Every structure is written in structure tokens, then in C-alpha cells.
From Swiss-Prot:
GO terms for molecular function: NADH dehydrogenase activity; oxidoreductase activity, acting on NAD(P)H, quinone or similar compound as acceptor; quinone binding. This is NADH-quinone oxidoreductase subunit H. NDH-1 is composed of 13 different subunits. Subunits NuoA, H, J, K, L, M, N constitute the membrane sector of the complex. It is an enzyme of class 7 (translocase). The gene is nuoH. The keyword Repeat does not apply.
Length: 325
């Protein structure tokens, strides 16, 4: 058939890759919510969800059905358009952040030359979703949570971006695939250890995960910026948070731990195992650390993380200039 051209086949394969990878990311985010509840129960010497299915295996399905049939209520005093758009923007921006992550040599949705900048741009877009949700709800607790989230995310995105500049300088490219190929013999976590530490801290803060979950602090803000949300709108925020964890874990693997590189096993398996390890670390951090005060979080970022990233950049620049001579 003459209408089947190589360009059409390439487009269809790209669409197939995008659908498969994005479905896997959404599924991983959903299953992580169940795994987190089970592991937190184990860490705290109690039972997790164990009533639906064998060992609670169908709890995720039950939660999805319950959330789907809940009333999609919009407060009368809210801005309906922005209130509805906020969870969609949050979910979409976090999902698109994964599009530039190469899971194997031939599997990447968008192999952009500005991959890192695109990821940072999507992380910045998620801030607007939180701000829209808090402001449009017309609720004082929602607005306070949104203001906290905006200030925290914008601050820690500075450290997130600066921590990656050392990796970019070493690889000589913003392209994720080039960065992974540059780690074929030595992972970036060794020469860029301080950059990795700062990126890990900033990644947890940008995801609003414990101990940086002040925007959702139940004891202070009654669940923060999504207090007025219910039904699938709340579900988009909920699943989006776990997709953010999957994305940050995948970025850690790609930028600092060699991506798909590893012996014996297929590249995709190595990438999945490394990503799963960092997803487990998110859960362990939640079970282990207390929540600090909000002023302590901001002070830690500007007084500890920022100097650490600047020192890392100066050392990286000095080493690169010394090697060039």
C-alpha cells in the first residue's frame, strides 16, 4: 500500500512508545500508593490495607472505583473554570516531565536537545496548578497552602536547576541520552556527589513529600491547597503526586546513576530496578523523618542547599578547566 511510508511508520512507532511509557508511569504511580501504605504499615509494626483481595491486592481497584463514583463537587464560592483546570494542569505537567527520560537506548518519548530545560519547565508549570487550586477555592486554608507550596517550590527549583549544571557541564549537552551515554564508564554520582545530594533534597521538596509537605500539613492547614477538591479532581492531584515521585526517581537514575547502564540484565530492567530503589527511598524517608517548621525548610534551602550547589559548580568548573589544559 503506497500510503504506508517510512515517515508514517516512524510516527506510529513514536506514538506507540509514548502511549506505552506514559501508561507504565501512571500505573507505577497508582501502584506506589498501595505499596506505600503496605510498607508504612510494616515500618510502623501494624497492618496495612489487607481486606480487599488476597493480602489487600485489590485495594487499589477499590479505591479507584470509590473515587470515580464520589460526587464531583465544586464550591459555590469558587472560580469554576480555574478550579477545574488546576488538577488537569498538575497531572499533565508532571506526566509530561517523564517524556524526556530515556528508559533504554531506543525507548524515549521525546529525545530533545533541551531535555533538562524541558523537565525544569514542566516542574515550574506545576507551581501554577497549585497556586490556581489554592486561589480558586476561595478558602483561607487552601490559599495558605498554595502560598507555602509556591514559595517552597520556586525556592527549591533554583537548587534543583543549579544541581544539574555540573552534570550538563561534564556531558557537554542538555540531552538526556547524551548524559546517559557519558556515564558508560563512570556514573555521575561519584564526581557530582554534592550535586546529587542537592538534587535529591530539592526533588523531595518539589514533590511536596515528607518532610517537605508543609503545603499539605494536616495539623496546620487541614490538607492544604486541595481541601475543597473531591472525586476525580482530587484523584488527579493524588495520582499526580506519585507520578512526580516516579519522575524524580527516574531523573535521579538518568542523571546520576548511569540510566540504563548495567551488566548482564537488559537495559530496561536496570532502569526499572534503579528507579524502584529510589521510589522506596521516598517511602522510607516518609516513615523515618519528622516534619520541620516551614521557616526551617526555607532557611535550610537558602543557607545550606544554595551554598552546596555553588561550591559544586565552582569545583566542577575548576576540574573541567584543569582537564582542558
Amino acid at each position: 500500500m503506497s500510503w504506508i511510508t517510512p515517515d508514517l511508520i516512524e510516527i506510529l512507532l513514536s506514538i506507540l512508545k509514548a502511549v506505552v511509557i506514559l501508561l507504565v508511569v501512571v500505573t507505577c504511580g497508582a501502584f506506589m500508593s498501595f505499596g506505600e501504605r503496605r510498607l508504612l504499615g510494616l515500618f510502623q509494626n501494624r497492618y496495612g490495607p489487607n481486606r480487599v483481595g488476597w493480602g489487600g491486592s485489590l485495594q487499589l481497584v477499590a479505591d479507584m472505583i470509590k473515587m470515580f463514583f464520589k460526587e464531583d463537587w465544586i464550591p459555590k464560592f469558587s472560580d469554576r473554570v480555574i478550579f477545574t483546570l488546576a488538577p488537569m494542569i498538575a497531572f499533565t505537567s508532571l506526566l509530561l516531565s517523564f517524556a524526556i527520560v530515556p528508559v533504554s537506548p531506543n525507548w524515549v518519548v521525546a529525545d530533545l536537545n533541551i531535555g533538562i530545560l524541558f523537565s525544569l519547565m514542566m516542574a515550574g508549570l506545576a507551581v501554577y496548578a497549585v497556586l490556581f487550586a489554592g486561589w480558586s477555592s476561595n478558602n483561607k486554608y487552601s490559599l495558605l497552602g498554595a502560598m507555602r507550596a509556591s514559595a517552597q517550590t520556586v525556592s527549591y527549583e533554583v537548587f534543583l536547576g543549579l544541581s544539574l549544571m555540573g552534570v550538563v557541564a561534564q556531558a557537554g549537552s542538555f540531552n538526556m541520552t547524551d548524559i546517559v551515554n557519558n556515564q558508560a564508564h563512570l556514573w555521575n554520582v561519584i564526581p557530582q556527589f554534592f550535586g546529587f545530594v542537592t538534587f535529591a533534597i530539592a526533588g523531595v521538596a518539589v514533590c511536596h513529600r515528607h518532610p517537605f509537605d508543609q503545603p499539605e500539613a494536616e495539623q496546620e492547614l487541614a490538607d492544604g491547597y486541595h481541601i475543597e477538591y473531591s472525586g476525580m479532581k482530587f484523584g488527579l492531584f493524588f495520582v499526580g503526586e506519585y507520578i512526580g515521585i516516579v519522575t524524580v526517581s527516574a531523573l535521579m537514575v538518568t542523571l546520576f546513576f548511569g540510566g540504563w547502564h548495567g551488566p548482564f540484565l537488559p537495559p530496561f530492567v536496570w532502569f526499572a530496578l534503579k528507579t524502584a530503589f529510589f521510589m522506596m527511598m521516598f517511602i522510607l524517608i516518609r516513615a523515618s523523618l519528622p516534619r520541620p517548621r516551614y521557616d526551617q525548610v526555607m532557611s535550610f534551602g537558602w543557607k545550606v542547599c544554595l551554598p552546596l550547589t555553588l561550591i559544586n559548580l565552582l569545583v566542577t568548573a575548576a576540574v573541567i578547566l584543569w582537564q582542558a589544559q
